[in-house]
Amino acid sequence: MSDKLPYKVADIGLAAWGRKALDIAENEMPGLMRMREMYSASKPLKGARIAGCLHMTVETAVLIETLVALGAEVRWSSCNIFSTQDHAAAAIAKAGIPVFAWKGETDEEYLWCIEQTLHFKDGPLNMILDDGGDLTNLIHTKYPQLLSGIRGISEETTTGVHNLYKMMSNGILKVPAINVNDSVTKSKFDNLYGCRESLIDGIKRATDVMIAGKVAVVAGYGDVGKGCAQALRGFGARVIITEIDPINALQAAMEGYEVTTMDEACKEGNIFVTTTGCVDIILGRHFEQMKDDAIVCNIGHFDVEIDVKWLNENAVEKVNIKPQVDRYWLKNGRRIILLAEGRLVNLGCAMGHPSFVMSNSFTNQVMAQIELWTHPDKYPVGVHFLPKKLDEAVAEAHLGKLNVKLTKLTEKQAQYLGMPINGPFKPDHYRY
């Protein structure tokens, strides 16, 4: 059935608007354009049937059309019920690429959309491009008969990578995977600089709140937390960090942030942002101690960090202010403003990361798909990384757009350092 369904989107009439947005984004995504220049003729992904489960945004549309330009067949769903940009989905559908995504899916519709991507006209999927692990998990649990035909998985985000390593340790991962998230040009750019801009965009569009002078609590000080903390401090907030890792906690303290527990911070904060990728970060006892009209949001992948169930069961009243903005009246008389139902605030309430930084991430995705498809012998079942040389190539593809001029090593300097004159310039264990 699924191979006969060309698409399901909110409104195909939005395609012209989506195409204009794609045209602008392409000019901000030099890495993906470089991929097209290098590989459109040779089509290294010819024969690949890629099922993609990743936020259906304008930037993702540029990724999808790059994969198609490189020879792949693609079917797509979003990895979040609120993250689809309907004009982008319409543009992809209009281009003849099967896409099943719209903003505001139910959980049942979300699963249905993923299932529409599993079968192509010439057979089932043979590659996975995932963000968060929902597609990977679905095939391993519900459609294991498809696993033998799948050559590889490329995983976009921290949560999905955790899932892959958990599957590997439990002996249930059956397909080779590349951890795209931990490419330096992904985690140190998308996670940090992307969140530094898109978090504020989401909070401002949702609430119009003045951030200066407020107390902001950021749960987690990984790359995402670092970007969020920088952004909030840049707007004039006093930022408090919560952390479990002593190294990250020390980093936060050395940057001048107060570091304490959520049990303490919940009494002080006006704005709360969870960034951990873990469960049970903000619970009922924290809500009960928050200030009136505290704003609570999440920028981790899943909606498990904030106990939304507690709010729904214990609030006296829930008032929807506008899409993805809800105000809960607690029994103590105070109110809580929850954004995007505890899901990704930057995509639920705004447009996600800017195109330029997503070009870094998605160029890694394209390279990972090419590697897995063309060199399956190099990647046994397990979780792998892209080679350092490719990571550096992703960065170099973006320098011209920023008018960056690289210094070149001389032969003498390269010999002195004991490295190739054209890199790689750092060992794999270097942390940047």
From Swiss-Prot:
Residue positions where Phosphotyrosine is found in the record: 193
Catalytic activity: S-adenosyl-L-homocysteine + H2O = L-homocysteine + adenosine
Entry-linked InterPro entries: Adenosylhomocyst_ase-like_sf (IPR042172), Adenosylhomocysteinase-like (IPR000043), Ado_hCys_hydrolase_NAD-bd (IPR015878), NAD(P)-bd_dom_sf (IPR036291), S-Ado-L-homoCys_hydrolase_CS (IPR020082)
Source taxon at top rank: Eukaryota
Region NAD binding, annotated ranges: 183-350
Physiological role: Catalyzes the hydrolysis of S-adenosyl-L-homocysteine to form adenosine and homocysteine. Binds copper ions.
Cellular localisation: Cytoplasm; Melanosome; Nucleus; Endoplasmic reticulum
Pfam families reported for this sequence: AdoHcyase, AdoHcyase_NAD
Co-factor(s): NAD(+)
Protein's name in the database: Adenosylhomocysteinase
Record note on quaternary structure: Homotetramer. Interaction with AHCYL1.
Residues bound to substrate: 57, 131, 156, 186, 190
Modified positions (N6-(2-hydroxyisobutyryl)lysine) in chain numbering: 186
Any single biological process term in GO: one-carbon metabolic process
GO molecular function, one term: copper ion binding
Recorded family membership: Belongs to the adenosylhomocysteinase family.
